[in-house]
């Protein structure tokens, strides 16, 4: 088989970084996708504008669309919003040293913890651009597990950080939550890919 890849998540209703999906295509379709029958296309049709244009497409989903209305950790009741990585800003250009662009798609949600989780906002000293939030006294901090999960399209009530009964420990810590969220295939994305494959399954493999 020749392998071709096509879909980028930024043109669908998800506020996240680009994903690439690889699909095996028969060798007689050497000029895929130009002459590949549209009915056989394994990918959902784009619905939002980001890397492509179209009057029938909706505006891209931004980080602000997803994170709007969430309380700051100190005001939250949700443990997944209260607890977050306290790794300090390094400013050396390495992973996890930039803040979320609220007017664009979100950065990569990594399956790691200390120092690799991007900042929800940086201080003015570190080049932060969310001036209104800083003026309101909001502090420099990294994304919470809840914010990462919303970017990855998990439901807002899906629990990640959980207490271990009456003890001071956790059944699942924030560090483990970051790893689970970062490793996950975004649920809404997986749903739409699966539904499209369901539609074309009989074309590929017969009834």
What positions do the PLM features span?
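Class I S-adenosyl-L-methionine
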Residues: 1-102
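C-terminal target-recognition/interaction regions appended to catalytic cores
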Residues: 61-207
């Amino acid at each position: 088989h020749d392998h071709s890849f096509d879909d980028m998540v930024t043109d669908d209703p998800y506020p996240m970084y680009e994903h690439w999906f690889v699909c095996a295509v028969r060798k007689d379709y050497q000029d895929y996708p130009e002459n590949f029958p549209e009915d056989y296309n394994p990918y959902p049709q784009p619905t939002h504008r980001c890397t492509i244009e179209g009057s029938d497409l909706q505006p891209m989903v931004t980080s602000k669309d997803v994170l709007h209305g969430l309380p700051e950790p100190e005001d939250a009741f949700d443990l997944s919003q209260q607890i977050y990585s306290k790794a300090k800003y390094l400013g050396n250009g390495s992973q996890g040293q930039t803040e979320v662009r609220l007017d664009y798609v979100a950065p990569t949600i990594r399956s790691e913890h200390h120092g690799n989780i991007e900042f929800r906002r940086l201080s003015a000293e570190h080049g932060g651009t969310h001036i209104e939030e800083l003026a309101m006294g909001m502090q420099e901090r990294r994304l919470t597990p809840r914010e990462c999960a919303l970017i990855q399209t998990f439901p807002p009530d899906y629990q990640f950080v959980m207490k271990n009964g009456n003890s001071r420990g956790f059944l699942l810590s924030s560090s483990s939550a970051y790893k689970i969220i970062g490793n996950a295939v975004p649920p809404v994305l997986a749903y739409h890919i699966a539904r499209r494959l369901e539609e074309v399954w009989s074309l590929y493999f017969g009834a």
